[in-house]
Amino acid sequence: YATRYIAMEYHKRDFDKANSYVSSAFYGDTIIASVILAIGVIFVLFIERFLNISPELIVSVKLLFLLVFVNFFFTTIQTVFNSTSYIKNRLDITGLVRVVGYIVEIILYLAIFKLFPPQVWYVGIVMLVVTAINFLAAIWMFHNMTPELKVERKLFSVDAVKKLVGNGIWNSINSLGITLNSGLD
């Protein structure tokens, strides 16, 4: 949801305000993702108390869940960097990167399951590699296509976070309402 505000200020050429949204969204997302990652690590440590897992699969399942939470962390903090493709109307580049990610994903699954004995945590490794490709591409686009935008701690604004969270929550509630309403048809 931050992309909307970043793009509006960017196109108004108010780079100070755009950078305030960029920095606030980045640090806000990082804080949220870090808290969820910490909770996820605690969950992983005690996963057998929450889920019924065969003893021989516990380590593999723990690794998978840990990799899923790490993947979530990077996907979440990547969000602000993805705004560049919308700002510059270059969704084609993002689409191309996703296609490359899908191809890498297929190749990795085929290679890993051909070369090694099957393990459930391989799925987490492949997810993390694909996320790394998307993450690096988003950062490259951000720095090269929108050099006016920067993530700086001094530009973090609690007011900007409140605005983004407030509108984001309202948007989420609205989307939930639409989903529930369309599900009742």
Named regions from a protein language model:
Residues 1-12, 26, 87, 146-148:
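Helix-loop junctions and terminal segments of transmembrane helices
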Residues 24, 33, 72, 101-106, ...:
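Residue-level recognition of pore/gate-forming positions within transmembrane alpha-helices
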Residues 73-97, 110, 121:
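Membrane-interface junctions at transmembrane-helix termini in multi-pass inner-membrane proteins
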Residues 42-45, 55-78, 107, 132-133, ...:
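Alpha-helical transmembrane segments of multi-pass membrane proteins
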